[in-house]
């Protein structure tokens, strides 16, 4: 197997797919900014942590179970099939509290996120609708991860991009021609993963398919084994929720709703950026796990180096685009032409995105550690960048430098985490079953 050729095949297709996934919220934000102005952008940014939490569970279960599946398949273990069925069953159970919250207390959730009375009134039905579709968001992650690990990254990419295209088109149709407003945007976003799952299901009718659904009761043991390898994905997604929540409260204190709206612009482009680096990590994961399952450690390390090199190159391209087109990007979400919001978002984009020179390598390394069955190290890396370092840096730097301190927290936290990650990667690695 030509590892380099396979690496770029899997990674390129996965990047496109995950960029498509991030467009769920990016499209929402653009159309809602046109329909509801600054308050609409503020609402979306307050909802982001809820999306992140849903995606975090989907990522942990889906990527973790698929990684277990890939390792066991490479070792010829028949029990590999049980992980797919268990992932679907457990995701549906975990989705129940989200659905109940959406049905009975969406307003309370928005208040907890820092929304005032106007924002709560604006976003009540939007929040209710997307929370009720939680099982589909989670299962979409699982289907995509397993189809990719079963040797069909192209179908996974097509499924994700098709769902995203549906979301973009019907966001516009539901919000404007049909005049459904924000609930229409939520409905378009909620239906998108249903379409993606339907397309992924084609894999089960192909000759290359080795996946089967095993009739079984949900197993806590299999779930824990899956989550051990998917924890880096969970913390990676959760880190976005933590970062967004902490930044929202700091910015509300420093600049009010306009500060949160400015961060909404930064955060939405950050979703796309993070998706690119997750695409590198998740695209390499099936190949790394296969090498690990066959005890080809040199091949796994080669893939890690390819991943980090690719991440650095992409970070340079990404920052060049952000630096060169900052005003254009900000204007897309500034339908009210607020000079203050534009000023905040302009400096925020240019400072915040410096962090991706470090974050790209951290995301790839955390994915590698999970793929080679080193969940403890993967968790340490992910918790550092997602919780410990970012919260500490944001509190300290915002107190010292105000708004610019908030933006600087992300690159500072990622730089600290990269030093820790290099130390963890240099620790001796053993082959485990």
Role assignments for model-derived ranges:
Residues 62, 129-148, 156-167, 185-200, ...:
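Short runs within selected transmembrane alpha-helices of multi-pass transporters and secretion channels
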Residues 29, 102, 145, 171, ...:
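Structural signal for membrane-spanning alpha-helices in multi-pass inner-membrane proteins
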Residues 14-63, 67, 130-137, 224-290, ...:
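Transmembrane helix-bundle signature of multi-pass secondary active exporters and lipid flippases
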Residues 1-15, 69-133, 177-231, 288-355, ...:
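Short alpha-helical transmembrane segments in multi-pass integral membrane proteins
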Residues 26, 35-38, 72, 149-150, ...:
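Helix-loop interface residues and adjacent transmembrane-helix termini in multi-pass membrane transporters
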Residues 41-100, 137-156, 262-326, 359-381:
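Small-residue-rich hydrophobic transmembrane alpha-helices
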Residues 53-56, 167-171, 197-201, 271-275, ...:
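Hydrophobic transmembrane alpha-helices of multi-pass small-molecule transporters
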Residues 29, 38-41, 153, 182, ...:
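Membrane-helix interface/capping residues of multi-pass secondary transporters
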